[in-house]
Amino acid sequence: MWQKWADVTQGHVAAPGPGDFAQMVAVLRKVLEERQPCAPEQCDERSALEGALRLATEHLHRALPDGGQGMSSLQEAARLADPAAFSIPASHRARGGTLVTSAKRAFVNGLEPFHVEMLRPQGNFNRALVRVLEYLTVHRALGLRDDVSSWAVAQLEPLAVPTRWVVGSHRGRVAGALVGFAKRGYLYTLGPVLEAVLQGQARWNLAMVEAIRAAAGAQAPGEAEARRHVADVEALREPLAGRTLPGALRVTQPLWGEVLRRQSRFNAESVLALANLLGTRTAPPQPPSLADYPAWCAAREPARVTAAQEAVARLSRRPLISLVTPVHDASEAFLRECLASVSSQVYADWEWLLVDDASTAPHLARILREAAERESRIRVLTASSEGDTARATNEGFAACRGDFVGFLGAEDTLSPHALAEVALAFLAQPELALLYTDEDGLDAQGHRSAPFFKPDWSPDLLRSVDYVRHFLVVRRETLAQVGGLREGFDGAQGHDLMLRLSEATSSIGHITEPLYHAREGSAASASRGAGLDTATKAGVRALSEHLARQGESAEVTSPAPIQYRVRYPVRGTPKVSIIVPFKDRPDLLRTLVDSLLAQTRYPHFEVLLVSNNSTRPETFALLEQWVDPRLVKLTWDHPFNYPAINNWAAKQASGELLLFLNNDMEVVDPSWLDELVSQAQRPEVGAVGCKLLFPEGTVQHAGVVVGMTGFAGHPFWRLPEGPISTPFGHTEWTRNWLSVTSACVILRREVFESLGGFDERFQVCGSDVELGLRLNAQGLRVVCTAQTRLIHHESASRRADAIPEADYWLSYAAYRPWLGPKGDPYYNPHLTLTATDCGLRRHPEDGEQLAVRTLGRDVPSARDVRGEQRARAQRHLIEHLEAWDFTPEQAQTSRESAPAALAALRAKGRVETATWFVPAFGHVYAGIHTIFRFADLMQRRHGVRSDFVIYDQPNVRPGDIEARVAAICPGAVGAVRVLRRPEDVALLPACDLALATAWTSAYRVLHHPRAGLRGYFVQDYEPLFHAAGTPSALAEQTYGLGFYGIFNTPGLYEHVVGLHGMEGAWFEPAVDGTLFHPRRPPRQGPVRVFFYGRPGNERNGFELGLAALAQLKRELGPAVEVLAAGAEWDPEAYGVRGLVTNLGMLPAERTGALYRECDVGLCFMFTRHPSYLPLEMMACGVTVVTNDNPTNRWLLTHGENCLLAEPTPSGVLARLRDAVSNGALRARLGTNAAERVSRTSWEAEVDRVMKGLLNTGAHPAATLDDRASSLEHAS
């Protein structure tokens, strides 16, 4: 992924999409979580990773398409609360769809202002309802049961009538009055019409108010009452459903339906949120409707045919495909349709063997003869004997010349691109030995129906049903290897062949297109097809022989026609450890344990009941009642982490098999554990789940589809159990999946341990799916058996909002390989991902796009990006607070011992060793340069050996620091040490003086046990670096520890000592006279103004300076030239192109020359720190314009060596005008400025500090003038 991003910058590949950025975010979040808590040696790395996370998150949000789906019904309702955010989808109709869509859009968009007014009261009700539902959801989650029904109803009832219109306008008085008049006229003229349209919505509103009244009461409604309220609002959620508008309005009903489309979706999500609040379920959904399946096909297949035709045209090799069709008394019309479908194939390299299998119908011979005469690729054979379809088919196969052989029924048809898709698939995957396609049914009128969209190769599904069915295409040599069809398996020949093929090869492909159309109720199948009973018996025999050939001892039965159950034997009686985590809910726990002990027939098991932070007395009383020796009671009282609880419990378990089971289950099938054990013992199987049902008999779990709902979902969820009709079959078949839910899953211990158990980075959701994905990656199957079931007492409404955000990101990273266009191999890309009913896919998004929309819009970090970043920064700070800490006793000891330590040093009369605590640095910036310059002069002039301790970056190399400093102050460096851990400060050698150089280092100096005097080299007032809060307070505390201060500038000394009463000395900074001097070159031309502009540093007043300079340039034009430097920024982006020239970052040696080429220098200093910038410009004879800062008055005197300005645009502009227009003023100020700076030298300042420290001369503080504001002396 990272290589892809790198390649983009070089133009090698297409730019990353939203899915790629989401993957980057997911991986970065995972890496950051792995670095919690932050270790000192990883601090810089973690900061860099957080910066990368911010960048990737910004790219993700910029790349997102509009739309999305909320994580929970309540979030989705909030997103849909504005009913007037119209969006009309394209019609699904194949004919006339464009016209219908245009009419709807014309009606909705053309009258949009009036529709907005019409729906405004309803929008107000929607927003109020969301607020109430949010409040009640939080209220109940906290366990509060006070009666808030009066408040809740008062929020909703006054807004419940959607036709109480009050028209206003945001426009001016005249225009607003006209617009308001038009809207009022529309509403009142059409009032009766609109009331009829909104009557159904009004009833829904009132029903919802009554439901909220019940939900907000002191007593929770009972189950029956809760279901009744949910059913009431559910029945009314479609505003126009079941209603016919009066009179002439009927013809416009579909148009009004589009106006209310979004409101209908809001109603549906609100009903789910209400059901969740009441702890009940909505009414079960119906199996998906397939009424529009022909139109669905017509809208999609022409493009597929064209694409296949174009792909075939590009082929350099076209293999020959042989079709074999036994013909016996087929309908003339249907046979001609079959012939026409093959003749119209867009792939031309085929042959067709039509085998006349003793037909008696007089038209058959004529049709077959005509077909062969008309088409040379058709050959007609006569079967050698009568009445055996398998033998006739094999005779056709024996005559084939093609590379691949396919089987086609005489009355069935193929899509025009069927053979093209087959050829393309075999050429794209030359390892394939065979493939099959999706299919549908064909009635007598030629209408397509009953589609069956199949999964990819699923061996356990094939043992439940012949799901491959029609249009199996096999490599000829593979078919010869297994001997073709076998006689004696009437009605199950295809199933038997597929089972034998699966024994010969695992290279089985699947084309996910309905290319085969099987005739329903044909004459041929009725006259010659085996009856269901015969076919079922043949299928049982085929499966039994297959298992015997595979060396598997198992019993095959048939629970329903042409459906099978393979009952694998339990080998021995291995012990099963059933692991049940729980927190209270004694009612659920009693149901589970009592039913498990009473119902389970399997004899050898233990139940590990793992309490996680249970607190209710009833729970503990229940546990005390149970004395069955099979019950093992454990406690895991740590913060909830579902995979961690189960991993820990698995280590306590003694069984060979581990069964993870939710506490809200109920056992109803005595053989449930026998079935799970028998499946789990199969060596090719990694994990086994089973069917879970809600108490009312609908499906809660029958497998997991990765990509459904964007992450992972349960197909058939809440559909009735049994052989219901969906395009994906039903839940009566045992299937393979990528995963099953850990609510009930069994694994062999050695398999579980070889995987390392569940991934504990997950907390609540996703670890079970991720485990299944790892099992599949290792070549082990995941099975969901349909042969047993449990009752799952889980809430049936969505609770995705209860899932930690980290689980979403971890899930995305794990699931992504199966989220794209191909999707989950055990599902089908033509089936819906936005619902769980396995209906037709009518949405364009794949699983990745759905997931990315959730991640980019609906998870907490997406809804509050700044809050997420703030949380990460604050968490980082919290993890380091231990290093920035002292007790009151430690602070008091430091303050009380400071005078004695200072007196002892002064009595000694010299400083022999100093230890400086400095932060790690990459380049030598001004503050660092001052520290090492000071140390260098202390050594050369006063004999002080200085050692340096890098305290904040454990991974830095001492040699790197030495090399960086040696270039500027070769005599400054003594020993350089790096603190690998905070406690390593105790190992430092003794020193006369230990100096902190930043507030973070003051805590290390405090804990230095062998420091003589503790000092503080103060170059800024660091609390002002932060907003008032924790960092600011932590910084401020360091000035009250009794350290001896050495202050950079008298102004900073005055400020800090005035606030905190520190004792210490100050020094004036000097400049490097070789770089900064007043020997200015002669220059002519416009007055040149320099501005130190850094947009990313707020204390430099970038906006204020840029505004004043741009205006100055506009006023004076070519008479003035404005230059800026200090950072890279684009003048065009700030609207000053042509007014200001930005030179960007300049090396130090270049800045002095630049200053001497400028006449006026503008800079600002809004904090208490000393700035070297005015010093350097003054040393070069520049007229400095800056703000009046009290801490800089030791240097700056208005009208004498600078111009001080009030920090407003006009104030700064006035001083700039004075400086630019008055050359004599500039000359005088520049000369005085250079002279003032030249008075100071580093040598003298170091001597001053040492005298003050050792009390060998006048205290520096005594020489400070109590200067009045120099602004008071202006003019």
Swiss-Prot record:
Q: Which keywords appear in this protein's UniProt record, sorted alphabetically?
A: Lipopolysaccharide biosynthesis
Gene3D superfamilies from the entry?
3.40.50.11090, Glycogen Phosphorylase B (3.40.50.2000), Spore Coat Polysaccharide Biosynthesis Protein SpsA, Chain A (3.90.550.10)
Q: Kindly give the CDD domains that the UniProt entry links to this protein.
A: GT2_RfbC_Mx_like (cd04184), GT4_PimA-like (cd03801), GT_2_like_c (cd04186)
Q: Example GO biological process term?
A: lipopolysaccharide biosynthetic process
List the InterPro entries: Glyco_trans_2-like (IPR001173), Glycosyltransf_2 (IPR050834), Nucleotide-diphossugar_trans (IPR029044), WsaF_C (IPR055050)
This molecule's function is given as: Involved in O-antigen biosynthesis.
Full protein name: O-antigen biosynthesis protein RfbC
